[in-house]
């Protein structure tokens, strides 16, 4: 049973790390920079990047 809990914990950890790294590939957003939105969009490959707090979040285009 402990082995199963360990496997689940590792899978959860890897899932969180993958999600974090996929969103963290862009540089930080600074509200004092007038070009922040353009830089965020460029970093996301022109797919609708948005600054949320200190990080740039890339939108998903379907």
From Swiss-Prot:
Keyword match Disulfide bond: yes
Cysteine disulfide partners in this protein: 26-43, 29-51, 40-56, 44-58
Chain positions listed as propeptide in the UniProt record: 62
Reported biotechnological use: Could be considered as a biological insecticide candidate, when fused to Galanthus nivalis agglutinin (GNA), a protein with the potential to cross the insect gut. This chimeric ButaIT/GNA variant shows a gain in toxicity against insects when administered orally, while maintaining similar effects as the wild-type toxin when injected (toxic to insects and non-toxic to mammals).
GO cellular component, one term: extracellular region
Residues making up the signal peptide according to the UniProt record: 1-24
Coiled-coil boundaries: none
Function, in words: Toxin with unknown function in healthy organisms. On glioma cells, interacts with chloride channels (probably ClC-3/CLCN3) and MMP2 at the surface of glioma cells. This complex is then internalized via caveolae, thus inhibiting the chloride channels necessary for cell shrinkage and tumor propagation. Induces flaccid paralysis in H.virescens larvae. Is not toxic to S.falculata larvae or mice.
The name this protein goes by in its record: Lepidopteran-selective toxin
Native source organism of the sequence: Hottentotta tamulus
